[in-house]
Amino acid sequence: MNLSLYFDKGTLLLYGAEEDQLTLLEAVDWDERTQCYRAPAVDYRRLVTTLREQKIPFQDHARKFSAATFPLKKKITPRSFQQEAADTWMTEQRGVVALPTGAGKTILAVMLIAKTGRPTLIHVPTIDLMRQWKEVLNDYFDSPIGLLGGGINNIQPITVATYDSALIHVTHKGNQFGLLVFDECHHLPGEQYQFTALGSIAPFRLGLTATPERADGKEAHLYELCGSLCYEVHIDELSGRTLAPYVVETIEVEMRPNEREQYETARETYTNFLRKSRVNFQHPNGWSIFLRKTSESPEGREAFKAYLLQKKLSQASGAKIDRLWELIQHHQGDRMLVFTQDNEMAYDIGRSFMLPVLTHHTKLPEREAFLKAFRTGEYPILVTSKVLNEGVDVPDANVGVIVSGSGSIREHVQRLGRILRARPGKQAVLYELVSGDTGEYFTNQRRRKHRAYEGTTVLPNQSGQNYSQIN
């Protein structure tokens, strides 16, 4: 009896395997419930390669796709780094390519979809990106483009899906695609999303991101799911060529006296509790330990309130709003994106200056209207929390102001990338407003060690700053 492979709910079933054959096949375990051997679907390529190399006969009932032809409607003339990335990826037909926002990751994927010639499932984090990808794919392929997400369930040889929808369907669609493309692939190692990769047999995998690093260090797991980091280009390498030239200005803002007093009081309450409870945020579970300890006593709950207050005061001080107004006045005629850490701050700024606000709560028709008005110049300023961090194309933006954000380097590189799409004569500038002598200041210092921030200028905490040097 020959060995047979079957796909079953995101795994592989192996029937008829001999004991001596199993010693050659890693990650294969006996399943008492089904009385057969089972392996993760992600191991399909490795298992099939081993079986062929060892000349072990087998029947493949798992794979439900075959080679396909996707001719391009128009010629692509890749930039040199895109061609290098494509050539490098094609050697293994697996791997992660890290390119800055605006450097043409989508066009690279189009090239590789055509070269690979396999039914392709493209994963994206948002519905906006799903629609954006479909528009580009329709420009280059005659083949119908399917969508999976936002209430649409239309599977085609080339399909774009949100990570959430792909996760739902992988148990029964995981054997129908030969190439998986993961846009913003740094999401992939997440506790849930990783199963979109684990549950698919696709032998060919392309990860796309601007910054593969994760705060939790799980980029190693990303490479296990998608292939190693095979090509990388940094923002500073493309500045002034493929991307617009840019500068980053960190502006230290001095809190108002009443804000400073509240901050110091709250900070003292919070840090005293940390010392007393011996909470160490350098520990991998430091944050979880802090949350647990703050829930165990009235003192802990007060410390948690103090933590939230000191954080809010440093991120959303009135002095920052004053400085933002100065920047808005200085950059009249430019297209500005204002970034905040949370929706509350974004809406506060929107109300203060009568500006349109984009968040995850903004309905799609309103979002599209805001983005169109931004492109035409009717709305020269957009305020957003995190919804523009990834993917949404705003090529006309040339000024970014980060009022507040997380400690994530990726988030700040993504926000920088929002304003770097090249235009003739374009000079981009990103301002970071940082409350001086606070935890936010030291977070900013760590972030500036990233190479994208080399050459950053730190402007001292003074009001009435002259910004003419940034023109």
What are the functions of these language-model segments?
Residues 282-363, 367:
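Conserved helicase/translocase motor-coupling segment
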Residues 91-116:
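Walker A/P-loop
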Residues 1-84:
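Accessory DNA-engaging acidic/polar modules
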Residues 131, 135, 144-155, 335-339, ...:
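Conserved helicase ATPase core of P-loop NTP-dependent helicases/translocases
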Residues 175-178, 220, 383, 390-406, ...:
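A short beta-strand element within the Helicase C-terminal
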Residues 418-446:
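Conserved segment of the helicase C-terminal RecA-like domain
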Residues 99, 211-212, 408-428:
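Conserved SF2 helicase motif VI
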Residues 186-247, 258-261, 265, 272:
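Post-DEXD/H (motif II) to motif III coupling segment of the RecA-like Helicase ATP-binding lobe
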